[in-house]
Amino acid sequence: MYWFKNAMIYKLTKELDWSEDKLQQNLAQCAYHPCGQSDMSKFGWTTPLRGAELFCFSVGKQILLVAHKEEKIIPAHVIKRELDNRINELEEKENRKLKKTEKQALKDDVVSVLLPRAFSKNQQTAIWIDTEKNLIYVDAASSKRAEDVLALLRKSLGSLPVVPLAFANEPSMVMTDWIIKNDMPQWLVPLEEAELKAADDRGIIRCKNQALDSEEMISHLQAGKFVTKLALEWEEHLTFVLNDDGTLKRLKFADMIREKNDDILKEDFAQRFDADFILMTGELAKLTENLIEHFGGEKNRL
């Protein structure tokens, strides 16, 4: 099962048709196929459930998709060495300096020769679509990776009206108040790791194994710095780092959560996958609901 390690959350701004047949048909048009000899990269959908034919896995109103990206890796120094050799040989043979366009043509030829022998880097990115709350969760640590996967989904569906989930109250202001006023919600526990920034972004303090209510930390906050990242534990169910943009990084589910379905036999892979997906999405949905409520609800957009 794809236990999310990060969660970049997006809000759908209008209802879409998530019927399984239509979704499967749309995703199949952008299915992942391995790189051929002349391909530098391939990007498309793969089946979430091993051995299945569907590109979407759904339970109730929750849908799981998995994007697969394959990139051929040719070290830059290998290309440069081969290209330099070819340029030197040709310039010596023709007794002249090659033009820029000629060098580019040689480089393209070098890459095409090296491609069939290049190693592949494979990367999978999971997307969970909560069609009940109109939220999309992307298991990505960077906005670039998340946006790439959303672009693939948009291409598959023809339209994907989404915006990053935003709160009415700025997370950095709320997290700063938590520390200064020692007023953490009962369902959260701080984990002695944080990042503080000045309003002008010029000063950054990163701390680990540091009591957040220490005089040193409080003085930084009283001097005008804000909490922009904060490591937290939620209900003893999972730990994560909350960022000032509302994203959740370094998600780690507690053993007692991950082991809840251990009574299901390993041979029943599909049943365990199903149960774990229900479990994970249920936990993250509750956490998201807690955060939205505590941060004053979702931000109204004009």
From Swiss-Prot:
May be involved in recombination. GO terms for molecular function: double-stranded DNA binding. The keyword Cytoplasm applies. InterPro entries: RdgC (IPR007476). This is Recombination-associated protein RdgC. The keyword Cytoplasm applies. It comes from Mannheimia succiniciproducens (strain KCTC 0769BP / MBEL55E). HAMAP family: RdgC (MF_00194). It comes from the Bacteria. It is found in: Cytoplasm, Nucleoid. The gene is rdgC. Belongs to the RdgC family. Keywords: Cytoplasm, DNA recombination. Its main location: cytoplasm. GO terms for biological process: DNA recombination; regulation of DNA recombination. GO terms for cellular component: bacterial nucleoid; cytoplasm.
